[in-house]
Swiss-Prot record:
Complex formation: Forms a heterotetramer with UvrA during the search for lesions. Interacts with UvrC in an incision complex.
One of the record's GO molecular function terms: ATP binding
The protein's name: UvrABC system protein B
Binding site for ATP: G44, V45, T46, G47, S48, G49, K50, T51
The species this protein was found in: Haemophilus influenzae (strain 86-028NP)
Lineage: Bacteria, Pseudomonadati, Pseudomonadota, Gammaproteobacteria, Pasteurellales
Record field: transmembrane: none
Superkingdom classification of source: Bacteria
Assigned protein family: Belongs to the UvrB family.
Keyword Amino-acid biosynthesis: no
Residue ranges of every copy of the Helicase ATP-binding domain listed in the record: 31-414
Record keywords, A-Z: ATP-binding, Cytoplasm, DNA damage, DNA excision, DNA repair, Excision nuclease, Nucleotide-binding, SOS response
Domain Helicase C-terminal: 436-589
Length: 679
């Protein structure tokens, strides 16, 4: 990879010193990494300060790191925490930049082809570019990523070749600079100066780098010499001072040199000939005509413009790979001695394994029916075995490690059970199923009187809805967290729970990882003896742990018998509780309540996806999949209907129901046109 310019050490900022199990965990993790151990697991309970431990390990070893989280919300939470620990270093955020993404798809049963449709979040795109730049330029880099890290990214070799190096005193013609900027996909805009654009005023060129959000660079030429390079604020124009050199990175990760594009076109033509022969031989004349027309159009676009819609489907040729080779990803930008930390590994690891299979089945249909060449199958996320080969030294972090992590780590499972705050794991009670609803009503009233909160987890959506109605009818302030709610609204519901807008939150499988609410003093698990995924040992420990941040934490398991999963979960929780009690007695610690600011949670949610907050819809019941709409009477009604339709479209796209998503998209177009016409 490129030569590292910045070798600044990591400087950890914190008001706290490691305590409890943290010092021995930090020492052991660091020692294992120094000894070259490939896999180890940090078994850290809720509230034990796992992130602080990891931050100390990174600072102690002074090595770049990537933190993988299972979703955008937890990635944003980790990013915020790491940013606070390392304000002087490069802490970056790398998640999917799509607010909405509907991939190209074909439904043979109805002969429906759905074009790719996407909405890109400009802020997250800038953060992704900043992440790769930091990995290439700086040693003091921490990148917090979601599973987007295993998806194809532009080839780092092409990316590095395309950079524009500027140096004070260098001899370069103005036209050369402008031509190079155009190659990097920057556009000239002398009126609106924004990310990824440049403007020219006489012999002064201003460039707003694609990876920057608050700094632009000014090139002052004298004849054909760069007389001065300086940085300035693109909003106010105030100068940050002169710099001796500056590197302009491409506007996108997918930029490709002209020679590589021309080589790719020749290879695409050869594959097209082979594919046409196959379809003719199989008497599939419609597919033959379809692949010819679509591919020829793409070739012409690439020849003229250097890119085409869906250019990622030709990534095999553009990155110079052979058939079946893994795509370039964020891992290719990482320094070779980086550390990989997989947070909530019991969820994240299976996610990584499942990404390839889902993507493959959709693409195979496109190839079979002549919409794409077979080489499109190489535009894919990493296979799990490829991820294993590319992953550097790894730390798995979880309160309930999965079988994969335990097998890989062997004996290197580092316990972090003791909390510095002295807080104990919840007391567990088992009560009969026959009284669960009325007993829960009584418990909820007691907690509401003390200004405490309750989480309730059920087995089915129907039961969650019925229970919500029942509690509501009996005067309990209750909300239902369902699968139709997007990431940001989910965070806002949790915020409302913390603020006391309501007292009881009912859910199914949403009340587990990363839901840290200090105000929750009771977790109620209904039908705890129904063995299965939602009532496995791991699920039960995670759910019980939601009450571990409160001084009066309690978990009630409603069950008529004790399953093996329940027995293991209760034994493990009691083991942790006893260890904490012993530690508290030995060190004279009195458990202290957590005073986490409510605002922090909301900021985290908005950081994950700012645009989606417009989709806020506060109904307590699950959203209906389809709805009939009366003609809107005013602008406000139009906006409400548009938001409702957008939510449904996002949901269908997320569930891979592309046909339904496309139908709603068309409905949205009509509604917007009608809105413009009426107004």
């Amino acid at each position: 990879m490129s030569e590292k310019i910045n070798t600044k050490p990591f400087i950890l900022h914190s008001d706290f010193r490691p305590s409890g199990d943290q010092p021995q965990a930090i020492e052991k993790l660091a020692e294992n990494l120094t000894d070259g151990l490939a896999h180890q697991t940090l078994l850290g309970v809720t509230g034990s300060g796992k992130t602080f431990t990891i931050a100390n390990v990174i600072a102690q070893l002074n090595r770049p790191a990537m933190l993988l989280a299972p979703n955008k919300t937890l990635a944003a939470q980790l990013y915020a925490e790491m940013k606070a620990f390392f304000p002087e270093n490069a802490v970056e955020y790398f998640v999917s930049y799509y607010d909405y993404y509907q991939p190209e798809a074909y439904v043979p049963s109805s002969d429906t082809f759905i074009e790719k449709d996407a909405s890109i979040n400009d802020q997250i795109e800038q953060m992704r570019l900043s992440a790769t730049k930091s990995f290439l330029e700086r040693r003091d880099t921490i990148v917090v990523a979601s599973v987007s890290a295993i998806y194809g990214l532009g080839d780092p070799d092409s990316y590095l070749q395309m950079m524009l190096h500027l140096q004070q005193g260098a001899i370069i013609d103005q036209r050369q600079i402008l031509a190079k900027l155009a190659e990097l996909q920057y556009t000239r805009n002398d009126q609106a100066f924004q990310r990824g654009t440049f403007r020219v005023r006489g012999e002064i060129i201003d460039i707003f780098p694609a990876e920057s959000d608050d700094r632009a660079v000014r090139i002052e030429l004298f004849d054909d010499e760069i007389e001065r390079l300086s940085l300035f604020d693109p909003l106010t124009g105030s100068s940050f001072g002169a710099v001796p050199r500056f590197t302009i990175y491409p506007k996108t990760h997918y930029v490709t040199p002209r020679e590589r594009i021309l080589d790719a076109i020749e290879n695409i033509k050869k594959e097209l000939v082979s594919r046409r022969e196959y379809f003719i031989k199989e008497h599939k004349l419609l597919e033959e005509q379809r692949i010819s027309q679509r591919t020829q159009f793409d070739i012409e676009m690439m020849n003229e413009l250097g890119y085409c819609s869906g250019i990622e489907n030709y990534s095999r040729y553009l990155s110079g790979r052979n058939e079946g080779e893994p795509p370039p990803t964020l891992f290719d930008y990482m320094p070779s001695d980086a550390i990989l930390i997989i947070d909530e590994s019991h969820v994240t690891v299976p996610q990584i394994g499942g990404m390839y299979r889902g993507d493959r089945s959709r693409k195979e249909t496109l190839v079979e029916y002549g919409f794409r060449l077979p080489s499109a199958l190489d535009n894919r996320p990493l296979r799990f075995e490829e991820f294993e080969r590319l992953a550097p030294q790894t730390i798995y972090v979880s309160a309930t490690p999965g079988p994969y992590e335990l097998e890989k780590s062997g004996t290197e499972i580092i316990d972090q059970v003791v909390r510095p705050t002295g807080l104990l794991d919840p007391l567990i009670e088992i009560r009969p199923v026959s009284i669960q609803v009325d007993d829960l009503l009584s418990e909820a009233r007691q907690r509401a009187d003390k200004n405490e909160r309750v989480l309730v987890t059920t087995l089915t959506k129907k039961m969650a809805e019925d229970l919500t109605d029942y509690l509501d009818e009996h005067g309990i302030r209750v909300r239902y967290l369902h699968s139709d709610i997007d990431t940001v609204e989910r965070v806002e519901i949790i915020r409302d729970l913390r603020l006391g807008e309501f007292d009881v939150l009912v859910g199914i499988n949403l009340l587990r990882e990363g839901l840290d609410i200090p105000e929750v003093s009771l977790v109620a698990i209904l039908d705890a003896d129904k063995e299965g995924f939602l009532r496995s040992e791991r699920s039960l420990i995670q759910t019980i742990g939601r009450a571990a941040r409160n001084l009066n934490g309690k978990a009630i398991l409603y069950a008529d018998s004790i399953t093996k999963s329940m027995e293991k979960a209760i034994t493990e929780t009691n083991r942790r509780r006893e260890k904490q009690i012993k530690y508290n007695e030995e060190h004279g610690i009195v458990p202290q309540a957590l005073n986490k600011k409510v605002g922090e949670l909301l900021d985290i949610g908005q950081g994950a996806n700012q645009k989606a907050k417009a989709n806020k819809q506060r109904g307590k019941m699950a959203a209906e999949p389809t709805a009939l709409y009366n003609a809107p009477k005013n602008a406000k009604e139009y906006q409400q209907q548009i938001k409702k339709l957008e939510q449904q479209m996002y949901k269908f796209a997320q569930d891979l129901e592309f046909e339904k998503a496309a139908a709603i998209r068309d409905q949205l177009h009509q509604l917007r046109e009608q809105f413009v016409f009426d107004n």
